[in-house]
């Protein structure tokens, strides 16, 4: 779920608040359209697509689904025992948080004009 995703981001990118990713580029945050502005925005596009795939699992609501995971010294692990939906959503969030950690953050791409840059 989004709360757990926020905590996964805190695990992999402890130097930056999750809030910095909430309105970044064309895909980080609500919705998403157009061409991603950079690698970090592509991480968000991939995460959005992953959640769309999760929704194809019967009854799976990725924004609200809780799952079991562990964060140890910046390393994320989705725990055994998650059901199909929880395991899928955990993987989506884990891969995105790892992607965020490896991508450059460009302050100029935070709060961009979506109508102008994301069509």
From Swiss-Prot:
According to the record, cofactor stoichiometry and binding are noted as: Binds 1 Ca(2+) ion.
Q: Which terms does the UniProt entry file under GO BP?
A: arachidonate secretion; fatty acid biosynthetic process; lipid catabolic process; phospholipid metabolic process; positive regulation of fibroblast proliferation
Give me the residues that bind Ca(2+), please. 27, 29, 31, 48
Keyword check for Hydrolase, yes or no.
yes
Q: Which cofactor does it need?
A: Ca(2+)
- What does the entry list under GO cellular component? extracellular region
Q: Where is this site: Activity and toxicity lost upon alkylation, Ca(2+) markedly slows inactivation?
A: 47
**Keywords attached to this entry:** Calcium, Disulfide bond, Hydrolase, Lipid degradation, Lipid metabolism, Metal-binding, Secreted, Toxin
**Known EC number:** 3.1.1.4
Note the SS bond partners: 11-71, 26-118, 28-44, 43-99, 50-92, 60-85, 78-90
Instruction: Give the similarity note.
Output: Belongs to the phospholipase A2 family. Group I subfamily. D49 sub-subfamily.
Q: What else is known?
A: Two forms of phospholipase A2 are found in Ringhals venom.
Q: What name does UniProt use for this protein?
A: Basic phospholipase A2 DE-1
The record lists the organism as Hemachatus haemachatus
């Amino acid at each position: 779920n989004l709360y757990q995703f926020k905590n996964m981001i805190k695990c992999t990118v402890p130097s930056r608040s999750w809030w910095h990713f909430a309105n970044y580029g064309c895909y980080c945050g609500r919705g998403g359209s157009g061409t991603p502005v950079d690698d970090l925005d592509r991480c968000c596009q991939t995460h959005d697509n992953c959640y769309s795939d999760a929704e194809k699992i019967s009854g799976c609501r990725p924004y609200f689904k809780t799952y079991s995971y562990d964060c140890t010294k910046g390393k994320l692990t989705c725990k055994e025992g998650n059901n199909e939906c929880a395991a899928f959503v955990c993987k989506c969030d884990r891969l995105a948080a790892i992607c965020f950690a490896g991508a450059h953050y460009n302050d100029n791409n935070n709060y961009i004009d979506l109508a102008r840059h994301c069509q």
